[in-house]
Each structure stands twice: as structure tokens, then as C-alpha cells.
């Protein structure tokens, strides 16, 4: 596997991990908000995780789009 493929897969894995982390945290907030005692401002914190989720999804979409628009790219 060449470096380009490794870099592509590293970025893809990073964004997928960020998406999974944000979704897991949001699931906790939605199902048991009292379980997160150190964050009394639940809406503000949830909004921050929504922003993290949206950013990671956008980056992943962009990365995958680059692969589609230039199939000669070696990844």
C-alpha cells in the first residue's frame, strides 16, 4: 500500500472516529442528561457536539468527493 492510500485511510478513519464519538456523546445527552453532572448547560454542550459531528461529516464527504471527481488519484 502506498503512502497516498495510507494518508487517505488515516483521514477517513479520523473523521469516522470523530463522528462516532460525537454520536455516542449525543446519545448520552439525549437518553440520560443527568448522567453528565459537570456540564449544567446541556443545550450549549449538545450544540457543540452537533457542530463537531457536522464538521467531521463534512470533512468525510469532502474527502470522499475528491476521490470521486478525480479517479486517477492513487487512493
Question: Which residues does each PLM region occupy?
Answer:
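Extended, charge-rich alpha-helical interface modules
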Residues: 2-75
Amino acid at each position: 500500500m502506498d503512502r497516498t492510500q495510507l494518508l487517505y485511510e488515516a483521514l477517513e478513519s479520523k473523521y469516522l472516529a470523530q463522528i462516532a464519538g460525537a454520536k455516542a456523546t449525543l446519545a448520552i445527552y439525549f437518553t440520560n442528561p443527568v448522567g453528565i453532572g459537570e456540564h449544567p448547560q446541556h443545550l450549549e454542550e449538545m450544540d457543540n457536539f452537533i457542530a463537531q459531528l457536522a464538521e467531521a461529516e463534512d470533512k468525510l464527504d469532502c474527502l470522499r468527493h475528491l476521490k470521486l471527481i478525480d479517479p486517477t488519484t492513487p487512493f
